[in-house]
């Protein structure tokens, strides 16, 4: 897309940045006013000073001082004096996946699966125990939901763009996240609407938003059926089929692939799932 004689709108964001740009461009006023450019914060992409000098709008997910030259305060100090800046949401929600862990070394870690695998049990025994252990007896599922809500409220406090109440109102009726940090198109559109309001720009065209895709659609992190039941979800039952990198899997099939990958000594679970696209694995 070619932009001529438009100030840059820099988005310093994670993987949510690209779909947010598409949602913002659905606003005719935003599209006329700015040439958006995304710099991925988690990839530590450097923003050239020439781009900061040409910046007419800086949208950023907050990064603390531990990020050094990419810290939000540092980047804000490098902007032109009158450049408007807005802290935007960095949306995360573990609610549907209480056993999720961000521990390094494997994709989409599950604390109970990892514990059972690390005990050295045979794969079929790992799966049997995992699928039939009463989660509500072993874990305080209500407290785990409260924990992720509290963490997200603290993160949301950095931005005037509110989204958590929307999540809490609707997440039981329909999926608003594909994974813990991959929001649905509906939630991306909700965040974009809040950004446009803060900037006093015209809202997005509803017809354009109806076609919005996030780029996350190829994978939905399967939900443990017991978690779905405990939290009263209208989705995520035992027979639910999930998109998993080119094929569909039930939760039990996904868990079996997790166990097989880990017991094979593989660390790239995403690659493992992608390679299984055309197989019976």
Question: How would you describe each model-predicted region?
Answer:
Residues 1-281:
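Extracellular glycan-modifying ectodomains
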């Amino acid at each position: 897309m070619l932009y001529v004689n438009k100030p840059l709108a820099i988005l310093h964001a994670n993987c949510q940045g690209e779909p947010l740009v598409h949602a913002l461009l659905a606003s005719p006023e935003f599209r006329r006013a700015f040439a958006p450019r995304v710099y991925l914060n988690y990839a530590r992409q450097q923003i050239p000073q020439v781009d900061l000098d040409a910046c007419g709008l800086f949208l950023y997910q907050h990064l603390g001082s531990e990020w050094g030259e990419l810290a939000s305060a540092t980047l804000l100090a490098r902007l032109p004096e009158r450049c408007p800046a807005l802290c935007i949401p960095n949306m995360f929600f573990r609610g549907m996946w209480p056993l999720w862990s961000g521990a390094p070394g494997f994709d989409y870690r599950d604390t109970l699966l990892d514990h059972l695998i690390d005990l050295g049990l045979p794969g079929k025994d790992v799966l049997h125990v995992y699928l039939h252990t009463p989660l509500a007896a072993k874990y305080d599922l209500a407290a785990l939901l409260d924990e992720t809500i509290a963490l997200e409220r603290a993160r949301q406090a950095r931005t005037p763009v509110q989204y958590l109440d929307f999540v809490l109102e609707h997440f039981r009726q329909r999926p608003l996240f594909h994974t813990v940090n991959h929001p649905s198109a509906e939630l991306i559109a909700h965040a974009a609407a809040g950004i446009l309001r803060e900037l006093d720009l015209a809202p997005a065209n509803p017809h354009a938003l109806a076609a919005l895709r996030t780029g996350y659609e190829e994978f939905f992190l399967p939900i443990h059926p017991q978690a779905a039941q405990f939290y009263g979800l209208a989705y995520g039952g035992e027979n639910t089929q999930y998109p998993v990198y080119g094929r569909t899997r039930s939760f039990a099939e996904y868990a079996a692939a997790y166990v097989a990958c880990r017991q094979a000594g593989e660390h790239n679970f995403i690659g493992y799932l992608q390679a299984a696209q055309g197989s019976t694995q």
